[in-house]
């Protein structure tokens, strides 16, 4: 049985709405069957300027709440992903897998569990006790380090996960993250007691993703059309 081949594209620091547009192009490509000979999906890696996002249960966040959060200096976006409110900002690795679940031989539930497992692998490789809890995401010592919220239509996924590397956690203090009362948030930097950047984490994250989903990740093959930073060969050193 062949191993799924997925592209990796690094978008860098990009606005949330712009990243949604990029996801949409990859989703449309998969729905159309893709170009002849092209890999069947992609992982889009990025970080965002400060933005609060809410999922499909957006009724809990009226215009007054949106105005309050915008007043802090952040953007505010309403989306079609699962889950409630969360924060994205610099120092947070965001991964948007645009994949066909059939190619991965996974149900939606198994896919979400796989995202959790990949991040848990990463955390444990760093010596951190990453774990699941009844609420979706990855937790370290009772605090959420990675939020997960996905959308799936016609077996094609979008949205994904956000892993706190050296994020300013103060932004989370203005909301109830993911609607979970009484739970805190944390970051790799806070847990390890040293600065951990996105560039430090991308390579081990991609390795953990490959191991969990039994796939092959390759750099985007058209950098002139998609001017982003792609993943180097593993022997080339850290990103």
Curated annotation (Swiss-Prot):
Region annotated Disordered, chain positions: 220-239
Broad enzyme group: transferase
Annotated catalysed reactions: octanoyl-[ACP] + L-lysyl-[protein] = N(6)-octanoyl-L-lysyl-[protein] + holo-[ACP] + H(+)
UniProt key word Acyltransferase: yes
GO molecular function, one term: ligase activity
Subcellular location: Mitochondrion
Protein's name according to its UniProt entry: Octanoyl-[acyl-carrier-protein]:protein N-octanoyltransferase LIPT2, mitochondrial
Disulfide bonds: none
Positions contributing to substrate binding: 81-88, 147-149, 160-162
Active site: 178
Chain ranges of the BPL/LPL catalytic domain: 37-217
One Pfam family linked to the record: LplA-B_cat
The enzyme's E.C. designation: 2.3.1.181
Miscellaneous information on this protein: In the reaction, the free carboxyl group of octanoic acid is attached via an amide linkage to the epsilon-amino group of a specific lysine residue of lipoyl domains of lipoate-dependent enzymes.
Biological process per Gene Ontology, one example term: positive regulation of oxygen metabolic process
Pathway: Protein modification; protein lipoylation via endogenous pathway; protein N(6)-(lipoyl)lysine from octanoyl-[acyl-carrier-protein]: step 1/2
Keywords of the record: Acyltransferase, Ligase, Mitochondrion, Transferase, Transit peptide
Summary of the function given for this chain in its UniProt record: Catalyzes the transfer of endogenously produced octanoic acid from octanoyl-acyl-carrier-protein (octanoyl-ACP) onto the lipoyl domains of lipoate-dependent enzymes such as the protein H of the glycine cleavage system (GCSH). Lipoyl-ACP can also act as a substrate although octanoyl-ACP is likely to be the physiological substrate.
Gene3D superfamilies xrefs: Bira Bifunctional Protein, Domain 2 (3.30.930.10)
């Amino acid at each position: 049985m062949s191993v799924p081949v997925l592209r990796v594209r690094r978008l860098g620091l990009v606005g949330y709405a712009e990243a949604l547009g990029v996801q949409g192009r990859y989703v449309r490509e998969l729905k159309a069957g893709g170009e002849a000979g092209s890999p069947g999906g992609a992982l889009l890696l990025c970080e965002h300027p400060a933005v609060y996002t809410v999922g499909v249960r957006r009724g809990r966040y009226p215009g007054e709440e949106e105005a309050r959060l915008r007043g802090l200096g952040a953007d505010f976006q309403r989306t079609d992903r699962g889950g409630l409110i969360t924060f994205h900002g610099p120092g947070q690795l965001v991964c948007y897998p645009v994949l066909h679940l059939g190619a991965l031989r996974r149900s939606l539930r198994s896919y979400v569990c796989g995202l959790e497992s990949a991040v848990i692998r990463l955390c444990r490789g760093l010596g951190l006790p990453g774990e699941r809890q009844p609420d979706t995401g990855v937790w370290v010592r009772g605090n959420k380090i990675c939020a997960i919220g996905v959308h799936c239509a016609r077996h094609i996924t979008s949205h994904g996960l956000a892993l706190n590397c050296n994020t300013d956690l103060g932004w989370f203090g203005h909301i109830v993250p993911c609607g979970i009362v009484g739970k805190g948030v944390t970051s790799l930097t806070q847990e390890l007691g040293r600065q951990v950047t996105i560039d430090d984490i991308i390579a081990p994250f991609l390795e953990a993703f490959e191991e969990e989903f039994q796939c092959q990740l390759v750099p985007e093959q058209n950098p002139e059309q998609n001017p982003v930073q792609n993943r180097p060969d593993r022997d080339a050193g850290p990103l």
